């Protein structure tokens, strides 16, 4: 992965037609230094929130590139090509803005800076529907204003584009705020998918085949992973996109939660508690990996197998 990204960055720097290579190299140095510092300081237990904040940067990049491409006076399209290009710009900024604001809220919830309790506003689904209608109407206005503007006029359609950006940011905030903190892993996976689609839309806008392919791969794999996670947790996939995910079920689980303090026990004690079973399946997950519990699990497995239990 590191080698591939290094080759991609090198090809981008050498392939870009610009006289400001010094700024590009400076940006690479600053970004690389920040990445190295984060990789060394962030613990595995904080990895989900790091992934969330990195997704926000992908969304922000899509928004900034979209505005820069739309306002570039050297970009000229006519007729159907102009309409298609404007739709690509619109979708890139739309998905990027939702990804950015949603990922920032997800980072805040995972890091404890924002309460993990779901924010269930009355009529939240009607609010989502209203935001969707506004996005469609403003998009139609944006395409018409841009098509009717003269060549070289970059300000035409800018106001609808800014309105849509604000609406998309609001939707991203509302979508993630309505989700309980315990369900954040599914949300992070979904935001990963959003970041991929934002990159793919940016690739169409810039006529960059590499961005289109990689963005589609990330977007589709993230969506499939989110669907599988929802099925495993007995959740509805569409509820993740609409918001309000994990409000009723999570609340009922919390009301019936067992009170008291957790007591640590040894691996031998765990094996003795499981000695009455005939077959045991141990499924490793993220928590086991973070806790580095593989050695303890191995000891439990040895004790159970010595008693004739199929593990």
Regions found by a protein language model. Give the residues of each.
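C-terminal ends of transmembrane helices
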Residues: 33-51, 103-118, 171-184, 226-230
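Structured cytosolic domains appended to multi-pass membrane proteins
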Residues: 258-311
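Transmembrane helix-loop junctions at the membrane interface of multipass transporters and ion channels
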Residues: 68-80, 143-155, 186, 193-213
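Cytoplasmic-side transmembrane-helix entry/capping segments in multi-pass membrane proteins
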Residues: 1-6, 24-27, 46-58, 118-129, ...
């Amino acid at each position: 992965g590191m080698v591939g990204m290094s080759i991609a960055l090198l090809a981008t720097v050498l392939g870009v037609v610009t006289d400001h290579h010094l700024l590009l190299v400076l940006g690479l140095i600053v970004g690389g230094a920040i990445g190295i510092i984060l990789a060394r300081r962030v613990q595995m237990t904080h990895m989900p929130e790091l992934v969330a904040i990195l997704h926000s940067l992908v969304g922000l990049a899509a928004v900034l590139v979209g505005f820069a491409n739309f306002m570039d006076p050297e970009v000229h399209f006519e007729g159907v090509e102009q309409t298609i290009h404007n739709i690509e710009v619109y979708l890139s900024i739309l998905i990027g803005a939702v990804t950015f604001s949603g990922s920032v809220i997800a980072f805040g919830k995972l890091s404890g800076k924002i309460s993990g309790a779901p924010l269930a506003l009355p009529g939240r689904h009607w609010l989502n529907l209203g935001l969707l209608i506004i996005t469609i109407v403003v998009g139609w206005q944006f395409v018409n204003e841009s098509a009717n503007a003269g060549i070289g006029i970059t300000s035409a359609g800018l106001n609808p584009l800014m309105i849509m950006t604000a609406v998309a940011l609001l939707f991203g905030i509302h979508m993630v705020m309505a989700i309980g903190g315990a369900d954040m892993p599914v949300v992070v996976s979904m935001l990963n998918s959003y970041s991929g689609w934002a990159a793919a839309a940016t690739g169409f806008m810039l006529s960059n085949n590499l961005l289109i392919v990689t963005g589609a791969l990330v977007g589709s794999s993230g969506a499939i992973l989110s669907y599988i996670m929802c099925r495993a947790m007995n959740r509805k996939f569409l509820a993740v996109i609409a918001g309000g995910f994990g409000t009723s079920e999570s609340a009922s689980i919390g009301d019936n939660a067992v009170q008291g303090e957790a007591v640590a026990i040894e691996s031998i004690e765990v094996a003795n508690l499981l000695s009455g079973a005939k077959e045991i399946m141990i499924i490793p997950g993220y928590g086991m990996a973070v806790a580095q519990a593989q050695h303890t699990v191995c000891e439990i497995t040895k004790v159970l197998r010595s008693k004739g239990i199929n593990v």
